[in-house]
Amino acid sequence: MSVLRHAAAHVLVDDVATPVLTDDQAHHVFRVLRVRDGEVVTVTDGRGRWCACRASGTDIEPIDAPTLVEPRRRPLTVGFAIPKQDRPEWIVQKLTEIGIDRIVLLHAERSVVRWTADRATKHVAKLLRVAAEALQQSRGVWLPAIEGPLTAADFLPSAAAAEPGARPISADDTSIAIGPEGGWTADELEWAAGTVSVGSTVLRVETATIVSASRIVMHAE
């Protein structure tokens, strides 16, 4: 895996066996990053497969057979109530860097931000692009699934809800839900598979999301 970390660039492509860079990717690799002939560039399909390539002109050529990184036996999921402005993008970026497998956007009972179907389609498409960029920056090989918005009623039965005063996150926790800044309602806490604490202080949605993600990844590794 040291090749991934030390390559001159890491690019998300459709097929790692016959990688083709888009015009934007080629510009970034050869103009922005200034990758030179002979330098190693790694590629991934975002589904666990990656390959080392050699830069040649404005193309890249595989120099090894593709490698498959097996998925986790128990995928890690983080759901969060959609916060205001561009904070969902920042959250998705960080969750991708941390290595979360599934990201779920939530509409909770006390949510201030609610996306219509049309708006959700546009936002999720943008978040997928953010995740792709974060995967390349962090040298990851598994692109997270991004789903939603789901209602809290649909998601919470399969997740532990973050709630002050609850038990600490443990290795048994693989799915965490972060509520809105107004907190979960009593009904939502009843729907949840359990409750966990992400700290003793009052955290913003984005902070609580990253803290919980870091902890479940730490327990999984």
Question: Where does each model-flagged region fall?
Answer:
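Active-site/ligand-binding-proximal alpha/beta "capping" segment
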Residues: 157-200
